[in-house]
């Protein structure tokens, strides 16, 4: 039976993996075994953190809206209850940006909800 040589594919596979580990610290960027493990773990973290980022931003928006509402004498839960009743269709991201960048518009929305 003939011997199967796999040199070119073998080198290309390693090269492709080591290219992905550029910027890693120490031997984790140059040692194939360590690079492979670190890259696999990094991909797991990336997947997990893509999910976590959505939760983190939502909680950030809630904190920002709540902080802006505290000075206006209305709670976050009452504010969103009023939004639903007033049929104002703005999401938390937009409201958060309004609370930071355009406080006058945000105050008008709060006034609309209070009345």
Curated annotation (Swiss-Prot):
Recorded GO CC terms: ribonucleoprotein complex; ribosome
GO molecular function, one term: rRNA binding
Keywords: Ribonucleoprotein, Ribosomal protein, RNA-binding, rRNA-binding
GO terms, biological process: ribosomal large subunit assembly; translation
Signal peptide: none
InterPro entries the UniProt entry points to: Ribosomal_bL20, Ribosomal_protein_bL20_C
Disulfide bonds: none
Family, as annotated: Belongs to the bacterial ribosomal protein bL20 family.
PANTHER family documented for this protein: 39S RIBOSOMAL PROTEIN L20 (PTHR10986)
Protein's job: Binds directly to 23S ribosomal RNA and is necessary for the in vitro assembly process of the 50S ribosomal subunit. It is not involved in the protein synthesizing functions of that subunit.
The protein's name in its UniProt record: Large ribosomal subunit protein bL20
Organism: Borrelia hermsii (strain HS1 / DAH)
Lineage: Bacteria, Pseudomonadati, Spirochaetota, Spirochaetia, Spirochaetales
